[in-house]
Amino acid sequence: MNPNQKIITIGSASLGLVILNVILHVVSIIVTVLVLSNNGTGPNCNGTIIREYNETVRVERITQWYNTNIIEYIEEPSNEYYMSNTEPLCEAQGFAPFSKDNGIRIGSRGHVFVIREPFVSCSPLECRTFFLTQGSLLNDKHSNGTVKDRSPYRTLMSVEVGQSPNVYQARFEAVAWSATACHDGKKWMTVGVTGPDAQAVAVVHYGGVPVDVINSWAGDILRTQESSCTCIKGDCYWVMTDGPANRQAQYRIFKAKDGRIIGQTDINFNGGHIEECSCYPNEGKVECVCRDNWTGTNRPVLVISPDLSYTVGYLCAGIPTDTPRGEDSQFTGSCTSPLGSQGYGVKGFGFRQGNDVWAGRTISRTSRSGFEIIKIRNGWTQNSKDQIRKQVIVDNLNWSGYSGSFTLPVELTKKGCLVPCFWVEMIRGKPEEITIWTSSSSIVMCGVDHKVASWSWHDGAILPFDIDKM
């Protein structure tokens, strides 16, 4: 092949490759256009990605534009509907562990708040543990003297249920040394009581914003439930006390919508005493089991209707459930009057199950140690001593404390009834132990369709801490 033929051959081959390359590009463009024009079958250059995190919910709108990501943080969408909460309570055969925060054990080397009065409340999406901090951390000098109930440093904060009350995941709710909180299906409502004893004020927050206030009307330590309030069809109910802790005081029911108070009524309960009610929804009404800090070792029972009419009395059962208390065998029970002369008391709870009642109490008759829940046949309506079931939650070798009720909404469980749940506070430190501080952790239990074995889910922290040895 002469040189001219070689040049022609190479040129022809090059031209062929160029033509092939052009054809491939044309085919590529055609395929791309066909794919992008086919709605729903191909990727879109613009899109929205929603990411949720456990601690809080952060919604990101991420627009993917060529090779550039534009990230825009948008407000978390609120729920559209109020929860009904008119369903009946589920029948519980036993109570299974839901969560345990181990806050004091973790706090020996972690950044955990000094707290008291923890309680749990649920929204349609989650349950949260609320607690009253002392404005200080465990194993720190500012924990000294935190046995005191009321101070300007106390705040209501919350974490997802099961998390320790740590500084990294806690959410501020209100300035408070007494509080309640609940979710109506759209937003959280919190009530935080703070201020001087004679002129305390309760600030009602809705969606994190102060909306309304309640001023002390008796001038004697206005206080509230220290457990979940109750929302039914968008209206939220709670109980407050103002007056002496050891004689006749004044009691009121409050009703709010979207955080604004729309009704209130005085509770006429001469000779009786109501504090720290543990309430839950049941068949369209609010049922509360409370604390008599005056004389009764039986617990007050308050049932609230949506129109704020109410019935009030005492848990009928012939078994006492407050602390301190006398022997079970010496207790007769009363549906209308306080029985006993021990005075003082501790926050507690009970659940109506038809005519029966599940009631929690300390195992010790004289101190806040141990905890059990017992089922008393006909105990809601009669002076029955027929104890048909018992489950130990904390053995009597370990400290307990307050306890209270809440329910799992049907939006969480997909059941046709409200699951009864309770929490038990386990107080550590002063006044029972040699420390400079007082704090607590909690165990949370929920009703199930099966019997559950007794055990001791106690606090378990080894005291004293380093700060106590200085």
Curated annotation (Swiss-Prot):
<keyword id="KW-1133">Transmembrane helix</keyword>
<feature type="glycosylation site" description="N-linked (GlcNAc...) asparagine; by host">
    <location>
        <position position="293"/>
    </location>
</feature>
<feature type="binding site">
    <location>
        <begin position="275"/>
        <end position="276"/>
    </location>
    <ligand>
        <name>substrate</name>
    </ligand>
</feature>
<comment type="function">
    <text>Catalyzes the removal of terminal sialic acid residues from viral and cellular glycoconjugates. Cleaves off the terminal sialic acids on the glycosylated HA during virus budding to facilitate virus release. Additionally helps virus spread through the circulation by further removing sialic acids from the cell surface. These cleavages prevent self-aggregation and ensure the efficient spread of the progeny virus from cell to cell. Otherwise, infection would be limited to one round of replication.</text>
</comment>
<keyword id="KW-1043">Host membrane</keyword>
<feature type="binding site">
    <location>
        <position position="296"/>
    </location>
    <ligand>
        <name>Ca(2+)</name>
    </ligand>
</feature>
<keyword id="KW-1015">Disulfide bond</keyword>
<feature type="disulfide bond">
    <location>
        <begin position="90"/>
        <end position="417"/>
    </location>
</feature>
<feature type="disulfide bond">
    <location>
        <begin position="421"/>
        <end position="446"/>
    </location>
</feature>
<dbReference type="InterPro" id="IPR036278">
    <property type="entry name" value="Sialidase_sf"/>
</dbReference>
<dbReference type="InterPro" id="IPR001860">
    <property type="entry name" value="Glyco_hydro_34"/>
</dbReference>
<feature type="binding site">
    <location>
        <position position="291"/>
    </location>
    <ligand>
        <name>substrate</name>
    </ligand>
</feature>
<feature type="active site" description="Nucleophile">
    <location>
        <position position="402"/>
    </location>
</feature>
<comment type="similarity">
    <text>Belongs to the glycosyl hydrolase 34 family.</text>
</comment>
<keyword id="KW-0326">Glycosidase</keyword>
<dbReference type="GO" id="GO:0005975">
    <property type="term" value="P:carbohydrate metabolic process"/>
</dbReference>
<protein>
    <recommendedName>
        <fullName>Neuraminidase</fullName>
        <ecNumber>3.2.1.18</ecNumber>
    </recommendedName>
</protein>
<feature type="binding site">
    <location>
        <position position="368"/>
    </location>
    <ligand>
        <name>substrate</name>
    </ligand>
</feature>
<feature type="glycosylation site" description="N-linked (GlcNAc...) asparagine; by host">
    <location>
        <position position="39"/>
    </location>
</feature>
<feature type="disulfide bond">
    <location>
        <begin position="279"/>
        <end position="288"/>
    </location>
</feature>
<feature type="disulfide bond">
    <location>
        <begin position="231"/>
        <end position="236"/>
    </location>
</feature>
<keyword id="KW-0479">Metal-binding</keyword>
<feature type="disulfide bond">
    <location>
        <begin position="182"/>
        <end position="229"/>
    </location>
</feature>
<keyword id="KW-0106">Calcium</keyword>
<feature type="glycosylation site" description="N-linked (GlcNAc...) asparagine; by host">
    <location>
        <position position="54"/>
    </location>
</feature>
<dbReference type="Pfam" id="PF00064">
    <property type="entry name" value="Neur"/>
</dbReference>
<feature type="topological domain" description="Virion surface">
    <location>
        <begin position="36"/>
        <end position="470"/>
    </location>
</feature>
<feature type="glycosylation site" description="N-linked (GlcNAc...) asparagine; by host">
    <location>
        <position position="144"/>
    </location>
</feature>
<feature type="disulfide bond">
    <location>
        <begin position="122"/>
        <end position="127"/>
    </location>
</feature>
<feature type="binding site">
    <location>
        <position position="150"/>
    </location>
    <ligand>
        <name>substrate</name>
    </ligand>
</feature>
<feature type="transmembrane region" description="Helical">
    <location>
        <begin position="15"/>
        <end position="35"/>
    </location>
</feature>
<feature type="region of interest" description="Involved in apical transport and lipid raft association">
    <location>
        <begin position="11"/>
        <end position="32"/>
    </location>
</feature>
<dbReference type="GO" id="GO:0055036">
    <property type="term" value="C:virion membrane"/>
</dbReference>
<keyword id="KW-0472">Membrane</keyword>
<feature type="glycosylation site" description="N-linked (GlcNAc...) asparagine; by host">
    <location>
        <position position="398"/>
    </location>
</feature>
<keyword id="KW-0325">Glycoprotein</keyword>
<dbReference type="GO" id="GO:0020002">
    <property type="term" value="C:host cell plasma membrane"/>
</dbReference>
<feature type="disulfide bond">
    <location>
        <begin position="316"/>
        <end position="335"/>
    </location>
</feature>
<comment type="subunit">
    <text>Homotetramer.</text>
</comment>
<keyword id="KW-0946">Virion</keyword>
<keyword id="KW-0735">Signal-anchor</keyword>
<dbReference type="GO" id="GO:0046872">
    <property type="term" value="F:metal ion binding"/>
</dbReference>
